[in-house]
C-alpha cells in the first residue's frame, strides 16, 4: 500500500518552512511514496513568493496546496497566538474536505503546534497515525505541556511566583525571563488547549537536535520527568528543519556581499512578521550608523502597536519611500550599508562568508539558520516564544547577546554597543567559536535519522 502523508501548516513562514522540510525528509529518508502539504494562509500570492524556492512543482510525489482564508472580518488586534489559533479553527472544514479528497487516503497526518485541533479531523477520517510538529524548541514544548498539566491553583502560583519556573528536567528560570506574564495570561486558554491536545497525538516531532537541547530532550525520554507529563507520547527531535541556501542564487544583496571582507557585515532582520515602532526604527538606524560596521538591514514600515504587524501586512512595500528613516541616514551610510525593503534571501545571506553577525528577533527558524551557518547573534525578541529563544541562545548556548527590551525603546548607544561586542570584542570571538561548534553538530544531525526506521510501516 502506498505510504502517503498529509501535512498541515498554520500561517507564517516560521510554520511553513519546517513543515515543507519535514515533508522532504519523509520522502527522502522514511520511505514515503507521496507527501501533500497544506499551507493555511490569508495571502496566497505572498505565501507563494516567500516559499518559491521550496516548491517542487515538477515532483508529483511532493504536492503543495494552499488553503486560503478571508480574515477581513476577523479581529486581528489580539495576541498572535490567539489570532493564529482562530485562523486555524476557521480553516478546519476546508482542511477536512481537502484531506478527504486525497487519493490514496493518507496514512500519516502531521500538523504544527497551532493546528492541534485538526488532530480530531485525522481521527474522524480514520488516519492511522497523527502527529504534531513543534516548529520551535523542545523547551517551548516542555513549557506548553507542563503548564497545561497543572491544576488551576498550581498554575496561578507559578504565574505569580517570584521564584523560578521549575519545569521537570529543564533549567530553572524566572517566568518573566521566559514569557511576558501579562501576555501569557491573555493567551492562557489557547495555550492550555494546545498543551492538552498535543498529548492526544501518536507522536511529536520537534525542530531541534540532541546536541542543541540535550537536557530537555533527555527529560522527554525520562518517564519520571517530562515523559510523565507527555503520558507516554514519544518525542522525536527531527531538526534542524531549515531551508538550505540555494547555490548560485542571483540577488543584488549577494552581489554587494561579494565585495565585502570576510565576517565583516552585520545582517539585521526581524523575520517575515516582525515590526518596530517609528521611534525604535530610528534608534536602530542611528545605532547601526554609530557602529561604523558594514550592514545589511531588511527594513519594513513602522507599526506602533503590534510587533507582529508585518505578518498580516499585505502591501508589497518594495518601492515605498523610506522616509521614516532618519534624515540623511541613507546618504551617510551608503558606503558601508545596504538597506533592503521588505525581504531579502536570508538563508543565502547567513551562508555568505562576509556575514559576521545577525541582529535577529529570535524566531526559531532564524535562530536555527544562524546556527547552521555559524553566525553569532544579537538577540532582540519581539513576540511569541522569542523571549525563550533569546534566553536560550544567550544564556545556555552562549552564542548571542540579548538586548533588554523590558525598558521600552532600545537606545542607539545600546544597539551600537551590542553589535560591537559581538563583532569586535573577545566575548564575540568566543560566541563565534561556540556557534561554529554547534554548526558541526547541526551538520551531523542532518545526516542522521532520528525516527525509528519501522515507525511508519
UniProtKB/Swiss-Prot annotation:
Keywords: Glycosyltransferase, Transferase. UDP-alpha-D-glucose binds at residues 272, 343-344, 361-369, 383-386. Its EC number is 2.4.1.-. It comes from the Eukaryota. One of its GO terms (molecular function) is UDP-glycosyltransferase activity. Belongs to the UDP-glycosyltransferase family. This is UDP-glycosyltransferase 72C1.
